[in-house]
Amino acid sequence: MSRVLVTGATGFVGRGVLEPLLAAGYDVHAISTRPAPAWSPEGVVWHQTDLLELGATSLVSELRPAQLLHFAWDAEPGRFWISEGNLHWVEASLRLLRAFAAAGGERAVLAGTSAEYAWEHETHCVEGVTPLAPATLYGASKHALRMIAEAHARQHDYALAWGRIFFVFGPFEDERRLGGSVASALAVGRRAETSPGKQVRDFLYAPELAEAFAALLGSDVTGAVNVASGQPVAIKELICALGEAAGRPDLVALGARAANPLEPASLTADVGRLRDEVGWTPTRSLAEAARETMAWWSHR
């Protein structure tokens, strides 16, 4: 049984990967700054530590995991784009990788972002083809970490894959994010005010994003991989799907807020590597994912 260490395991994405990893037969160890959560799947071993502290990586030396799945980062909505925390997480991530390599680690998968790409007016992102020119501190920090991590992996002979996350929605989403804002309003019968939602994006349901990362970890694929649905939609399609799932399409107020003029009109992902090399594709339709999302919000 291969031991995997998961960071960011209580986060929006990280929490969903635990059950797929257990189902795949991993010995799952998870890191959190708080005690083990009550919702934890049976079989996960929790370790309370703060990776931003200098001595935190001693845990890696003790556990000697063969695999590493690293999600932990500063992801506070509205703040993470410009947060100094991005720099702290670059430093912490490099300490983590050094400890992982020193402990005999074999394969690491780290979470990247679509914000590493150059966002033009319309951008279809293809690994190794689309220019990497991040416009934010968040994107630049992830981009810099990837370059250093890949060089480190080559030098220390461990495999490394980099999963670039695009746009995500689903249970446990922060109410300050698009999906969380709309779903939380609909769940209590409140008007969901949004922009016209004409921009095109690639949305992936959070539990499926977690499944994709578990599949990436279990594969032999290295380098950057877009982790997305490959099924771009206008933002308003997601918003309206949530409205229909809630049974309250009348509460959806498209155009009640102005669109951000700085956002690209279209930002989509090529998922050829994920589909053909990793062997993973999503199975839920947008409507199915919206129904599951609203069911969670209605019973939380």
Residue positions per predicted region:
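Rossmann-fold cofactor-recognition segment
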Residues: 41-53
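Conserved Rossmann-fold NAD(P)-dependent oxidoreductase catalytic core, especially the SDR/UDP-sugar
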Residues: 70, 94-137
